[in-house]
């Protein structure tokens, strides 16, 4: 998700940020007290207050609204007609909202101030006690960051959510994954993050102990008792031993015990640029997710922003959940070709399609996640991406290598179709900027504005028609 440096800093874990508040965590009382149960019930009821079956959520603030709008247009060219929520934290201009709500090419969209809702939420049976923040200013301070994504899940009117970062460009329609076995069985689908920073973030060690991380400590102290009255999708008991020297109060999954983060190979686990979440199927996990950002003693787990919170919530809810079959990839122009499974590519994040295919060569490039989606020019300089690698593969530590440079990989150059599609997305973004320029620049001359606006609408429609025709040629992977 593209954020400026101030907003990104607000979400960083550090001695003065998020996960150092672990000491405030749920104490593990044998019998949850009334206040805890009231809070949990409130979180559950707020999150389950849905009115639409399924939709897309793209959190925004003013500088990235055009990027989000161009993403919606891109998705519409892929046949995606799902409604879209654009939650913000009081930092999107009314003029921007009014402009884009008038554009029929965008389909069904809704802007709303999620921080206003969060600031007004009180505990059931104790209306003087706020749930997320004491007032709107506190909500602005708290949620004008990556954490807006968490409350966007909580307050979404959609039962089934596909959350996407605005700075994402797709090459295959993501809504295919609503039909995947992974999603249908669990109501979740999470993407893997880089295997890096093995002594930082989730993997930062506690008090110099080389065998205990902040993730270990948080999860060992978490008390699931207040949440156990909420339904969950029960999973089988783990068959693997716990490699960490901590005792857990919940039943862990084999996925956790075998994960790269739990085994101290990485400080990251989830790339939340795309995330599927069914609030009705994952009721307990959704309440736990909400509790991470509530004014309570639960505290927020160790994570770079919101990324890992969906994973923590699922694991602590003792529910079934699903991850991509494939490791995170990369996209960039700096490719060192040393042959298959031996090359290096430096660049930004990319994901291949998350469902295993008949062979690695059949797994297509799925999406890019970077504000550089607007700047790559494959027709001028070759752009490469990392081909599929299974998520359970541990390539080894980065050592002196840059985290942005996955190694031991197989790379591929953008195909003409991929290059054309990316160019189309970039042109869609330029046209959304033109929409906004015309609105502000011609305000004093309504007739001229209408003429220019219709012309811009025509350009958008024409480009979208071309992109639809091109997308019909895409080979659709198996789900």
Question: What kind of region is each of these model predictions?
Answer:
Residues 1-479:
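Glycosyltransferase catalytic domains, chiefly GT-A lineage
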């Amino acid at each position: 998700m593209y954020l400026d440096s101030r907003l990104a800093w607000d979400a960083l874990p550090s001695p003065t940020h998020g996960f150092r508040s672990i000491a405030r965590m749920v104490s593990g009382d044998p019998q949850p007290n009334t206040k805890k149960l009231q809070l949990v019930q409130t979180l559950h009821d707020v999150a389950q207050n849905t009115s639409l079956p399924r939709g897309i959520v793209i959190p925004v603030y003013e500088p990235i609204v055009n990027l989000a709008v161009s993403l919606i247009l891109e998705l519409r060219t892929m046949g995606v007609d799902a409604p879209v929520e654009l939650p913000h934290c009081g930092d999107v201009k009314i003029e921007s909202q009014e402009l884009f709500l008038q554009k029929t090419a965008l389909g069904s969209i809704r802007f709303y101030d999620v921080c206003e809702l969060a600031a007004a939420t009180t505990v059931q049976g104790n209306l003087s006690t706020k749930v997320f923040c004491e007032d709107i200013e506190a909500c602005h301070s708290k949620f004008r960051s990556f954490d807006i994504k968490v409350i966007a899940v909580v307050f979404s009117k959609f039962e089934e959510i596909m959350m996407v970062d605005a700075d994402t460009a797709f090459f295959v329609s993501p809504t295919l994954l609503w039909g995947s076995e992974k999603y249908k069985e669990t109501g979740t689908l999470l993407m893997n993050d880089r295997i890096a920073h093995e002594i930082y973030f989730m993997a930062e060690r506690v008090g110099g102990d080389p065998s205990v991380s902040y993730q270990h400590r948080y999860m060992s102290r978490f008390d699931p008792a207040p949440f156990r009255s909420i339904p969950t999708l029960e999973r089988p008991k783990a068959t693997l031993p716990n490699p960490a020297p901590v005792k857990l109060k919940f039943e862990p999954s084999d996925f956790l015990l075998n994960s790269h983060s739990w085994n101290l190979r990485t400080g990251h686990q989830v790339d939340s640029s795309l995330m599927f979440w069914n609030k009705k199927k994952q009721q307990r996990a959704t309440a736990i997710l909400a509790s991470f950002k509530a004014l309570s003693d639960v505290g927020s787990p160790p994570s770079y922003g919101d990324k890992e919170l969906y994973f923590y919530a699922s694991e602590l809810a003792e529910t079934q959940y699903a991850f991509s079959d494939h490791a995170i990839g990369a996209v960039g122009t700096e490719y060192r070709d040393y042959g298959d499974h031996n090359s290096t590519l430096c660049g930004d994040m990319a994901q291949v399609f998350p469902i295993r295919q008949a062979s690695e060569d059949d797994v297509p490039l799925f999406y890019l996640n970077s504000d550089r989606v607007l700047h790559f020019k494959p027709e001028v300089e070759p752009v490469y991406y990392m081909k599929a690698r299974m998520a359970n593969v541990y390539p080894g530590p980065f050592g002196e290598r840059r985290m942005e440079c996955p190694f031991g990989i197989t790379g591929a150059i953008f195909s003409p179709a991929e290059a054309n599609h990316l160019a189309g997305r970039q042109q869609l973004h330029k046209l959304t900027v033109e929409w906004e320029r015309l609105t502000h620049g011609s305000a004093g001359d309504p007739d001229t504005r209408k003429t220019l606006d219709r012309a811009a609408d025509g350009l958008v429609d024409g480009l979208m028609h071309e992109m639809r025709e091109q997308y019909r040629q895409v080979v659709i992977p198996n789900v």
